[in-house]
């Protein structure tokens, strides 16, 4: 008998919840809008989606989303569905069509959000997952313990390759561990990819010869498949140790193809995540979403940051990071490294460390480093000092007595 995939949803409906659950199950498996003689009991038993659980929560007077059936009461519930793996086989795109396809558009539904996903070993074992993960990333970055201290090239776009390389030079002078392109910086006319990689890697390789370790730079290779392969190969040939892709831009198939080709860690940027999560009555929670990208082979996954510049609450950020650090299942851990970013400074270090319970993470600060009044190297040292304090259980003020860079940073980290 085929193992099953289980997906859990928050659901709102103006109709009978049990009937709506059956409509969703039918739409996402063997059913259609009319009864068919060919949809036999045996076929439904073998291939149909099952309603595993339906827990009523509460009701509302108005619908969360427009365009559905009119009603004087809208019932909210937790719905769990399951499907046999044989319906779609070991395919991420076809899994996506099943668990997150037409069901969001059904007129019976006035709210639907995918909140959990359980994948059996018969599915997860078909995927290689991250090639490097936490241990491989630490080895390449030369950071055996503690957080990987990182940044984003700023301004995000508009610098030339030479100006970018100069920023990298200043960051390395501050002993940075990790540098990434902004998601907007790919292969524009002012900063062509090849010229940028060569200019930056000259600086990185020269510094590595002197420092004994090489800073990890995540170059944004996002593009068409052939472009991404060529860009990856250039980074590898120049001695680079990481490539970055924008996940929603290239999709699961794009990531899988790069995973098959790559000899470097894949840094996964979640640009566009807001349209999937921001409406609480529609879309995805991060926990099920990130599973698919880890299966596809992503080594680092952005999770936003505490007290960020966006709209996401701290509790959601923490849940996202914990999800990335959790094994997919007992047969396939597929661990990846959470990346904290967005309005980050050293002030978030202690709370981040306490919430996650470990330092297996990349903490990137753009303005929090580049805006330091004493310059970029001092900005790097200030962030590192903040993490020393966090891991030692000391206050920033106490650590600042030993770190002039941190002391001056406290005035502009607001």
From Swiss-Prot:
It comes from the Bacteria. It catalyses: 3-oxoisoapionate 4-phosphate + H2O = (2R)-3-phosphoglycerate + glycolate + H(+). Signal peptide: none annotated. Its EC number is 3.7.1.28. Keywords: Carbohydrate metabolism, Hydrolase, Magnesium, Metal-binding. Its cofactor is Mg(2+). Mg(2+) binds at residues 180, 182-183. The modification N6-carboxylysine is found at residue 180. It holds the Pfam family RuBisCO_large. One of its GO terms (biological process) is carbon fixation. One of its GO terms (molecular function) is ribulose-bisphosphate carboxylase activity. Pathway: Carbohydrate metabolism. Involved in catabolism of D-apiose. Catalyzes the conversion of 3-oxo-isoapionate 4-phosphate to 3-phosphoglycerate and glycolate. PANTHER family: RIBULOSE BISPHOSPHATE CARBOXYLASE, RIBULOSE BISPHOSPHATE CARBOXYLASE LARGE CHAIN. Belongs to the RuBisCO large chain family. This is 3-oxo-isoapionate-4-phosphate transcarboxylase/hydrolase. It comes from Xanthobacter autotrophicus (strain ATCC BAA-1158 / Py2). The lineage of its organism: Bacteria, Pseudomonadati, Pseudomonadota, Alphaproteobacteria, Hyphomicrobiales. The gene is oiaT.
């Amino acid at each position: 008998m085929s193992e099953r995939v289980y997906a859990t949803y928050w659901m709102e409906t103006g109709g009978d919840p049990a009937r709506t659950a059956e409509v969703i199950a039918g739409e996402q498996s063997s059913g259609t809008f009319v009864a068919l003689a060919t949809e036999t009991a045996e076929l439904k038993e073998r291939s149909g989606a099952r309603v595993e659980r339906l827990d009523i929560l509460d009701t509302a007077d108005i619908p969360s989303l427009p365009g559905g059936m009119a009603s004087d009461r809208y019932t909210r519930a937790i719905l769990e569905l399951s499907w046999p793996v044989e319906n779609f086989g070991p395919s991420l795109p076809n899994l996506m069509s099943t668990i997150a396809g037409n069901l969001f558009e059904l007129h019976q539904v006035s709210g639907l959000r995918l909140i959990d996903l359980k994948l059996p070993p018969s599915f997860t074992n078909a995927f290689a997952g991250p090639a490097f993960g936490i241990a491989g990333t630490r080895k390449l970055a030369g950071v055996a313990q503690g957080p990987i201290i990182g940044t984003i090239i700023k301004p995000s776009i508009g610098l030339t390759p030479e100006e970018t390389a100069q920023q990298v030079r200043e960051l390395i002078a501050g002993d940075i561990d990790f540098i990434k392109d902004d998601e907007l910086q790919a292969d524009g006319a002012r900063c062509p990819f090849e010229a940028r990689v060569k200019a930056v890697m000259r600086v990185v390789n020269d510094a590595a010869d002197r420092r004994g370790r090489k800073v990890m730079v995540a170059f944004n290779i996002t593009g068409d498949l052939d472009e991404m392969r060529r860009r990856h190969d250039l980074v590898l040939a120049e001695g680079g140790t990481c490539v970055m892709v924008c996940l929603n831009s290239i999709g699961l198939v794009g990531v899988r193809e790069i995973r098959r080709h790559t000899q470097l860690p894949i840094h996964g940027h979640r640009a566009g995540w807001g349209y999937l999560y921001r409406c609480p009555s529609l879309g995805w929670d991060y926990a099920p979403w990130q599973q698919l990208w880890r299966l596809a082979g992503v080594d680092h996954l952005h999770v936003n940051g505490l007290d960020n510049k966006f709209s996401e609450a701290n509790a959601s950020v923490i849940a996202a990071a914990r999800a990335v650090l959790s094994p997919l299942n007992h047969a396939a851990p597929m661990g990846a490294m959470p990346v904290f970013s967005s309005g980050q400074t050293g002030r978030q270090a202690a709370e981040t460390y306490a919430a996650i319970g470990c330092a297996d993470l990349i903490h990137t600060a753009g303005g929090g480093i580049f805006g330091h009044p004493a310059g970029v190297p001092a900005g790097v040292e200030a962030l590192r000092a903040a993490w020393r304090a966090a891991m030692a259980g000391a206050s920033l003020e106490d650590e600042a007595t030993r770190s002039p860079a941190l002391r001056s940073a406290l005035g502009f980290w607001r």
